[in-house]
């Protein structure tokens, strides 16, 4: 079986991760003690993707939980599904990273990383044919960003040919938790560009907007935001866990979505959007799902796809539906909005269909788009970074942990390069390839 090893780090990562396991357990009919009480053989057919089956018949998530302070871990452990995880897989320190990337990456995190890697190794050895890793973390704090990227680079060294998928929560444009978010995020992106294969970009503000606008929640809690994220995470991997007519796995996803290796930051969407507790009463049609899924307001990160162009996109439909209708609808979207797709990648939208819908819904769809407009996110973080870095504000917290200013400069220029790469492909047309060949040769020389 093609197993996926799930790793969650830091406060944000652990909260999203805990929610994700609630969703996956519900889909596979596994209760809070790890026993199966579902009603369909299909739930068990490929349950090994995310679960180990223990000798006593209990299912244990292939999950590693890490943090530099015990608080969040304790709340996961005392939460509804706290007892389902393997107790040895909780790895935590006592000191905390204090929202400092350097502490997570170089000092506190580096002390704990070997303990985490031991658990990861143990889980990987338990797999029959490990397909890849998925990491949940935020980029604004210290642990998820600093230690998260440290772990990703260590796993990259040890398992170079396995897929590395991240669910990364970016700092929001208006809602800021800490002043040093732009530093932490830039240093993390610098790592993710090099070491991750696919990054699903999320951000709290876009999620707030969805809760507020679409779901009509007046005071959305983090629980509501995490509910949205977990629905998307479950959608991304549903093809691996259930039989379908058009299946895909992490590598197929990457092959179809990533035209150039560095451009692997995706925006995600989900349909139908329903608030927690009130599942939609009317059944949706494929055209309605498609329409909602491509709607710019439903993207889970603060970038507007109408400001750029899609290089590639992938849609995953769940439920009993006609594959023909799905294909027609997807073609329809591309024909009507052809200006939003680059013309030099024909047929750049892939669709997959999985027969089993999420719990409580008849049909659903998950959207993953590789759009050049994601540069808005990087650009925004970069501007905030530069404003502070120019004055060397807050820098002593990082240099005090042994970091060098040079590292900041490198991270900044790497992120700015990323923005201009997105811009270059946004402006490219099918017939001006002559100039590009020269540019690419120059770029090779610079590398």
Curated annotation (Swiss-Prot):
Disulfide bonds: none annotated. Mg(2+) binds at residue 69. Its main location: cytoplasm. Residues 419-447 are annotated as: Disordered. One of its GO terms (molecular function) is structural constituent of cytoskeleton. Its cofactor is Mg(2+). PROSITE patterns: TUBULIN (PS00227), TUBULIN_B_AUTOREG (PS00228). Induction: Down-regulated by abscisic acid (ABA). Signal peptide: none annotated. GTP binds at residues 11, 69, 138, 142-144, 204, 226. Keywords: Cytoplasm, Cytoskeleton, GTP-binding, Magnesium, Metal-binding, Microtubule, Nucleotide-binding. Expressed in leaf sheaths and suspension cultured cells. GO terms for cellular component: cytoplasm; microtubule. One of its GO terms (biological process) is mitotic cell cycle. Residues 429-447 have a biased composition (Acidic residues). It is found in: Cytoplasm, Cytoskeleton. Pfam families: Tubulin, Tubulin_C. Tubulin is the major constituent of microtubules, a cylinder consisting of laterally associated linear protofilaments composed of alpha- and beta-tubulin heterodimers. Microtubules grow by the addition of GTP-tubulin dimers to the microtubule end, where a stabilizing cap forms. Below the cap, tubulin dimers are in GDP-bound state, owing to GTPase activity of alpha-tubulin. Dimer of alpha and beta chains. A typical microtubule is a hollow water-filled tube with an outer diameter of 25 nm and an inner diameter of 15 nM. Alpha-beta heterodimers associate head-to-tail to form protofilaments running lengthwise along the microtubule wall with the beta-tubulin subunit facing the microtubule plus end conferring a structural polarity. Microtubules usually have 13 protofilaments but different protofilament numbers can be found in some organisms and specialized cells. PANTHER family: TUBULIN (PTHR11588). Belongs to the tubulin family. This is Tubulin beta-2 chain. It comes from Oryza sativa subsp. japonica (Rice).
